[in-house]
A protein has these predicted regions:
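Residues immediately flanking
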Residues: 62, 87, 127
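Mobile-element integrase/transposase regions
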Residues: 22, 26-83, 91-92, 103-112, ...
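Short small-residue beta-strand/loop micro-motif enriched in glycine and branched aliphatics
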Residues: 90-95, 148-150
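DNA-binding alpha-helical recognition surfaces that contact promoter or target DNA
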Residues: 6, 22, 26, 190
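A short, amphipathic alpha-helix used for macromolecular contacts
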Residues: 1-20, 63-70
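A short acidic/small-residue loop/turn micro-motif
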Residues: 97-102
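RNase H-like two-metal-ion nuclease catalytic core shared by retroviral integrases
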Residues: 123-127, 131-143, 147-173, 183-189, ...
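Active-site-proximal acidic segments at structured loop/helix or strand boundaries
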Residues: 171-219
Length: 219
């Protein structure tokens, strides 16, 4: 607080004797910017999430993927990966590429998740437009799914999905981008399915020290 007062004085915003430190502290407290509040925020941001079984927590996300060719003229379109990752096992129970990041894509993927594995206890997503749909929130409520949403622009609170996206880009999408001919959306999804089944789900994960498929199956 003293440093802030010194800055205000040097910039001639206030005279040194006109602003008490206690007054400034009160304003910070009301605005949620006190040291105590900021320390609490820091702990919340980097708090480690612990789960003990599969589908206790599932994380959903969209991210920009490689280009695909679309239509009779083979126009290049950016594909978007939309998927769900199980926190406990790092298994991907549902994931595919779409041409749009919208409610229709979310609805399709969400249905596939439920049909294949049933509802998770908690579903963690960001504040993307698709996740704000009233019908999506109503569906989660009707199914007894606790819907948790990360704060906007706080990617560090979603470390699991960020790490998966990095793995997806480095191991799979980089290979796709290196090809001479753009794939169709169906081809891209077929390759993704094979990569998940034969590579990602079988490789030992550095944090769990188990392969995602094995850890998911045993829990």
């Amino acid at each position: 607080t003293k440093t802030i007062i010194d800055i205000l004085v040097r910039r001639h915003v206030v005279a040194r004797d006109d602003l008490a430190r206690s007054t400034l502290d009160r304003h910070f407290e009301r605005a949620g910017l006190s040291r105590r509040a900021l320390r609490s925020l820091g702990r919340e941001t980097f708090r480690r999430i612990e789960t003990t079984t599969s589908f206790e927590l599932v994380v959903g996300d969209f991210h920009h993927g490689p280009y695909v060719r679309v239509g009779a003229d083979d126009a290049a379109r950016r594909a978007l990966f939309g998927g769900f990752i199980d926190h406990f096992s790092r298994y991907v129970p549902e994931g595919r590429y779409y041409l749009h990041e919208d409610f229709a894509a979310l609805r399709f993927g969400f249905r596939q998740l439920l049909i294949g594995h049933g509802p998770p206890v908690t579903l963690f997503v960001d504040h993307g437009a698709a996740y704000q749909a009233t019908r999506f929130h109503a569906a989660c409520d009707a199914l007894g799914i606790r819907l948790a949403q990360s704060r906007p622009y706080r990617a560090e609170a979603r470390g699991l999905i960020e790490r998966f996206n990095r793995t997806l880009k480095e191991q799979f999408e980089s290979e796709v981008r290196g090809r001479d001919l753009l794939p169709t959306l169906d081809e891209l999804n077929a390759w993704l399915e094979a990569w998940l089944a034969e590579r990602y789900h079988k490789d030992v994960h550095s944090e769990t020290t188990e392969a995602p498929a094995e850890r998911f199956a045993r829990s």
